[in-house]
Design a protein with these regions (language model features):
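Cleavable N-terminal signal peptides
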Residues: 11-13, 20-23
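Beta-strand-enriched cores of mature, soluble protein domains
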Residues: 24-159
Length: 159
């Protein structure tokens, strides 16, 4: 698997986690499933002696169809991921950040990590408007399909 494809796959999975939010239910935050798509727009690889780091920037779209009332159905985001691979291009893990200004003007910021299995763990770290009360919400996810050039679809579930 190419470094770009591996990096894109994990990077997308990473910040795809961004779309998973939560709703209040019985006084507690409750999460829901979400789906996202990632299309890489740029990448840069820095090679070391024992591995490489690939930085990937992508434009993502999140399906919030299961989100609480008042949240938009579709949200666009810009994601930045750093993926570490060994000398053979095998994924070791990475980190990512996604930022979004939704159609209503509300802002959300997500951070995530992922391991060599491609499973990512993400957190909504900060938000305004409808996202403000959801800061700290956690979710997990992975890719469900990917194109040869690195774009893909991922699925998220609340933790």
């Amino acid at each position: 698997m190419s470094i770009m494809k591996t990096a894109a796959k994990l990077a997308v999975a990473l910040l795809v986690a961004v779309p998973v939010n939560s709703a209040f239910a019985g006084g507690h935050l409750k999460g829901w499933e979400a789906t996202g798509s990632q299309m890489p727009v740029s990448s840069e690889t820095i090679a070391g002696k024992t591995g490489s780091i690939t930085h990937i920037k992508s434009k993502d779209m999140w399906d919030y169809s299961k989100a609480p009332e008042g949240m938009p159905r579709v949200v666009g985001a810009t994601c930045h991921n750093s993926v570490v691979t060994d000398p053979d291009g095998v994924l070791l893990g990475g980190v990512g950040v996604c930022e979004s200004v939704d159609p209503n003007g509300d802002v959300s910021l997500y951070s995530a990590t992922f391991g060599k299995d491609g499973v990512y763990n993400a957190t909504l770290t900060h938000g305004t408007g409808v996202y403000a009360d959801y800061a700290g919400i956690k979710f997990t996810g992975s890719f469900i399909g990917q194109l040869p050039e690195g774009g893909g679809i991922y699925h998220l579930t609340p933790k």
